[in-house]
Amino acid sequence: MNHILQAILLGIIEGLTEFLPISSTAHLLIAEDMLGFHAPGEVFPVVIQLGAILAVVAVYWRKFWDVLVTLPSSQDSRHFVLTVLIAFLPSVVAGLLLHGFIKKVLFSPEVAPLVIATSLLLGGILILVLERVRPAVPRFSDGDRLPYAKAFQIGLCQVLAIFPGVSRSGATILGGEMLGVSRPAAALFTFYLAVPTMLGATVLDIYKNRDALVGAAWTDIGIGFVTAFLVALVVVKGFIGFLSRYGLAPFGWYRIAAGLALFAWIALA
């Protein structure tokens, strides 16, 4: 398979999985290994991730624009910005302190497959269990107006996503539900929180890999970026409706199946 087709396929995988609770990082790492896709190195997944992030901005641009223009005069806008920043803070601290450990240990070829398989399997089981014990009547149903304490607690849940295979969206949506936030509101807040979180992670990774930017295969990167953006647009637009109807259980079963399949693959390799 040539690089263009590989870039398209990886862009599709990134766009599909970035905002679903199944871990885009796990799927990209596994797909890259199976496809033998190594060029242009670590720069490719970092940049195409930005395409998926921009899909959120494209879908919710009116919300972000209204907040921006009314920020000086609107208490609601200031509250919204503060909740997102408060939830973002734990990931900033964890990312800056643990970036080297995350990349060198958790993402090492020797450790990553086992971490991913374990995270997928345990995460799937946890989803199925917690979906049964979550509060029957949510206390908070507005993703734009969460209390600061709840936003911070959701941000702490997001830190778990430093482990490949955990899923940032899965951790925040499930954590939000357990904190009394309705499923649609938790998913909406997850989308909002994704913008600074993933943008910050992307900027940090690009800076750390700045030497690799020279001579990178920008055609492959551009194709993956655009593909991830377009696919993520569809996912972002339909995800909350799907979640409201079916819940997280389908993703829990998928994660269990994927984790078991990966364990089998590791054993046979």
Question: Where are these predicted regions, by residue range?
Answer:
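Multi-pass membrane proteins that catalyze or facilitate reactions on polyprenyl-/lipid-phosphate substrates
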Residues: 1-269
